[in-house]
């Protein structure tokens, strides 16, 4: 998969930073409508120190956050939203179907389905080796800094 935005370019689009920037690169992108990102899950992730030391599993809330960050790239790189912030406003129909563990390549796909003023919705899916790890509907709010 060809990289469209690398880690440093992602940091120019969304405000997240280590240790909370949860996407490594963007491999597909359609301005304002769709984004696919990759997270290479390393055994050195800070969250694995406590979740769980004997059986490392990426917390589901961080998978949904990675999906939200992927959606934020799609929205915040559009001309009308550059320099703004995207806030998580809700999550519906969230399902976790596969554990994400060190060494996994997490593919994060978000399609923006609705925008009404500063509020938007998107369908999101995280997969590992083609198997769905998480799926959900995200709601977000765009706000000026």
UniProtKB/Swiss-Prot annotation:
This is 3-hydroxyacyl-[acyl-carrier-protein] dehydratase FabZ. The lineage of its organism: Bacteria, Bacillati, Bacillota, Bacilli, Bacillales. GO terms for molecular function: (3R)-hydroxyacyl-[acyl-carrier-protein] dehydratase activity. The active site is at 51. It holds the Pfam family FabA. One of its GO terms (biological process) is fatty acid biosynthetic process. It comes from the Bacteria. It is found in: Cytoplasm. Its EC number is 4.2.1.59. One of its GO terms (cellular component) is cytoplasm.
């Amino acid at each position: 998969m060809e990289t469209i935005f690398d880690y440093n370019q992602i940091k120019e689009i969304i405000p997240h930073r280590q240790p909370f920037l949860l996407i490594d690169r963007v491999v597909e992108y359609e301005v304002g409508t769709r984004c696919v990102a990759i997270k290479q899950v390393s055994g050195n992730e800070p969250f694995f120190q406590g979740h769980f030391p004997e059986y490392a599993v990426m917390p589901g809330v961080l998978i949904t956050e990675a999906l939200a960050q992927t959606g934020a790239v799609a929205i915040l790189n559009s001309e009308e939203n550059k320099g703004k912030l995207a806030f998580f406003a809700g999550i519906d129909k969230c399902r976790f179907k596969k554990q994400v563990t060190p060494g996994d390549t997490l593919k994060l796909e978000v399609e923006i389905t609705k925008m009404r003023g500063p509020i938007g919705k998107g369908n999101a899916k995280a997969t590992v080796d083609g198997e769905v790890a998480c799926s959900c509907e995200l709601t977000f709010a765009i706000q000026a800094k």
